[in-house]
């Protein structure tokens, strides 16, 4: 679990590692002006689970630093904004996959939520997004009622552009999905769950 990032000269074939810490470094993205590289990784503490963070360095591997954000979540799928002032990323928060962005000094914000999975038969979270040079984003959109569609947006907006399950929903009615939280009897921690009620459920019956 100790991967490094390399620079490869495609003419000579020479390559050089530009990271060297004890821990994984992966998913490099070069800034649009070609001066910086953003990447994901963490210092390996040999634990069963560790969260990936965003790091930035110069193109030659110098001046590495971690972007310190007030966000206790695992980060994935990074993109530079068109002007290289922000980095967009993906993360999961309480069962919902979101797109966020941060400045290079860690000023973080949530851009949009309801990033959905890739299976049209199941409303799983996860999924992917991409970012254009003018900061418009496209992503796999999904809710409990509309799994595996596509959406696009700009500056926090979102517009669904597909309706892949329309032929099914024309004659099927879904039950209402409710999020619930309850306290563990073992250690008092809060546990998240969901209730799916039958279609046309009447609480009085």
Residue ranges of model-derived segments:
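Conserved beta-strand position repeated once per blade in WD40 beta-propeller domains
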Residues: 27, 77-79, 128
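Hydrophobic beta-strand positions that form the internal "hydrophobic ladder"
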Residues: 34-37, 86-87, 137-138
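Conserved beta-strand positions that form and line the central face of beta-propeller blades
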Residues: 14-18, 36, 65-67, 98, ...
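Residue-level detector of Asp-centered blade-edge/turn motifs that repeat once per structural unit
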Residues: 32-33, 82-83, 131-133
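Short loop/turn segments that connect beta-strands within beta-propeller blades
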Residues: 9-13, 58-62, 103-107, 154-156
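Non-catalytic accessory segments flanking enzyme active sites
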Residues: 1, 90, 110-204
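A flexible loop/linker signature enriched in serine peptidases of the S9 family
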Residues: 1-6, 17-26, 38-55, 66-76, ...
